Amino acid sequence: MTAPPWSRRVRRLLFLIVAGLAAACDGGPKGPGTRDGVVEGPAKLGAVVLEVTGIGITGFKGRGDTRAYDAVVSAAEGRHRVVLVDAAGGLIEFGITVEDLDAEPPLVTVLVAAGSDNQAQLSTGVVVRLDR
């Protein structure tokens, strides 16, 4: 028994709809944007100095009460030095502005940490988390 001629058209139409939906699912945000990050320590933090290395980094932003100051260390390597200061102390929130959110996340290293009392702290236990 053969299928009616309209069933081929229905199958083709369903195939085109499924193919179109699959093409529309691109896997997430692309293009420029900001990756949010937080710095936490075992004690109340007032400031940290970070080294941030990555391709396509265009700037840094403080979030909440945090202020961000940055300088390019090596443009060829995409290496930046960032000072994050939160006078109230506690959770230090910041953003990294990038050219492409789909690119690999930057590598972040804590160089120096200080408490809200301006006393240097060991960077052991100070953790930086970036969103993907």
Q: Residue ranges of each PLM-predicted region?
A:
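Sec-dependent bacterial lipoprotein signal peptides
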Residues: 1-25
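Acidic, low-complexity intrinsically disordered segments
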Residues: 25-132
